[in-house]
Regions:
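Metal-dependent catalytic core segments for phosphate chemistry
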Residues: 142-160, 244-249, 308, 314-340
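Solvent-exposed alpha-helices and their adjacent loops that cap or buttress functional pockets
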Residues: 118, 143-146, 270-273, 298-300, ...
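Short, surface-exposed amphipathic charged segments that create phosphate/polyanion-binding patches used
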Residues: 95-99, 236-244, 357-361
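Generic long, charged, amphipathic alpha-helical segments
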Residues: 329-360
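Hard-cation-handling environments
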Residues: 178-319, 329-330
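A conditional alpha-helix N-cap/helix-loop micro-motif detector
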Residues: 9, 171-175, 259-260, 284, ...
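His/Asp/Glu-rich metal-coordinating catalytic cores
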Residues: 1-4, 9-13, 19-218, 222
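Short, basic, glycine/proline-bearing loop/turn elements
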Residues: 3, 123, 156-162, 254, ...
């Protein structure tokens, strides 16, 4: 048996440790430079699961068990193998596989399986999430087209949304909007811009955007990265990146434009302070993490802006924040009046838009 991980985003990889908790001992196959990030994300997930179960059990007199523990994560890692892309790897006479770049996030890949029975070979392609091949995001690698497979199990995130535009024009407009919000809110109004962001990929992309906006500017905003997991992934990127991406990332990290907040006490101090700044914190959907404390502080503040930069599921706190007509927001059973400004940048998606999906699949 084999388990294939197309990429390390939580919705595609963070149930794998549970499979090992339940007794599985199959090898997990992922692309090169993915294992350390998978480890960091899975350990963080285990910690959150164990912590939340303790709270729920205590408050409701239950005896729930966490999805998995840190020991299950380490068991998974014992069986996790990194494999190179664009190389057909033969398992036996009947099965081979190839990992092909998907252009979604760092290390994302499509999985092409070759099944040979009675001398006849058929192929199955599992795309995982596919990136935007026209605009693309930094530190990702380019999407690579697979010319043919007998059967395709393909992503369709925007398969019913031809109205969503994420092209070059939309990206430029969003970058202009991003810069305008920062300079109006921070430089002119001495306020704050709070950015809920996914720890993996989106936060690093935002940091590079900010660096490139202001590296040659006389005025630079104060920028905080307030998330232990995000910081670990920044460190992983320093080890994983190669070529021009590595050069650009190292230049960004050497710029001293960013302050990384690891300790909880420093995060609490930042929440309580009135310093005009940009704060990037996780989680992107605002369902957990330090971002919730920043939102409690900033949602009632008319001199604060929440900038939403990613997908949010219906009913998540992030989706509620996108509704500018809401009068109140409830966080941790406490209601807060909505006085902050709220904006969305829609072109930063790591997913292929509708018309690219049509082109990829036809």
């Amino acid at each position: 048996d084999l388990i294939f991980g197309t990429h390390v985003h939580a919705d595609h990889s963070l149930l794998i440790p549970k499979i090992y908790r339940d007794g599985c001992r199959a090898a997990t196959i992922i692309s090169e430079n993915s294992k350390q990030i998978l480890k960091d994300m899975a350990l963080d997930s285990a910690y959150i699961s164990e912590r939340d179960v303790l709270v729920i059990n205590s408050q409701h007199n239950k005896n729930y068990k966490p999805l998995y523990s840190a020991s299950d994560v380490y068991k998974m890692l014992e069986y996790t193998l990194e494999k190179p892309v664009n190389q057909k790897i033969v398992i036996d006479d009947e099965l081979a596989f190839e990992l092909i770049p998907a252009g979604h996030i760092l290390g994302s890949c499509q999985v092409k399986l070759y099944f040979t029975i009675d001398g006849t070979t058929k192929t199955l392609l599992v795309t995982g999430d596919l990136g935007n091949k026209i605009v693309g995001n930094r530190f990702v690698g380019k999407y690579q087209q697979v010319e043919y497979a007998d059967v395709v199990i393909g992503e369709s995130t925007y398969g019913d949304r031809p109205d969503i535009k994420t092209g070059i024009k939309e990206r430029k407009n969003d970058l202009d909007k991003f810069k305008s919000i920062i300079e109006t809110q921070i430089h002119e109004m001495n306020g704050r811009v709070i950015i809920p962001s996914f720890s993996m990929s989106r936060s690093q992309q935002l940091a590079l955007m900010l660096y490139e906006m202001y590296k040659d500017s006389d005025w630079k905003p104060k920028i905080y990265i307030d998330s232990p997991l995000t910081i670990k992934i920044f460190e992983d990127y320093e080890e994983c990146l190669e070529g021009q991406d590595k050069i650009d990332f190292d230049n960004m990290m050497a710029s001293n434009m960013f302050t990384f907040i690891k300790e909880s006490e420093d995060s609490k101090y930042l929440v309580a302070s009135n310093e005009p700044c940009v704060i990037i914190s996780s989680s992107g959907m605002c369902q957990s993490g330090r971002i919730r404390h920043h939102l409690k502080r900033c949602i009632p503040d008319s001199n604060a802006t929440v900038l939403l930069v990613g997908f949010s599921t219906e009913g998540s706190l992030a989706s509620l924040l996108k509704d500018n007509k809401r009068k109140t927001i409830t966080i941790d059973q406490k209601e807060y009046p909505c006085r902050c400004a709220s904006y969305s940048l829609k072109s930063l998606s790591g997913h292929a838009p509708f018309w690219q999906l049509v082109d990829m699949y036809t």
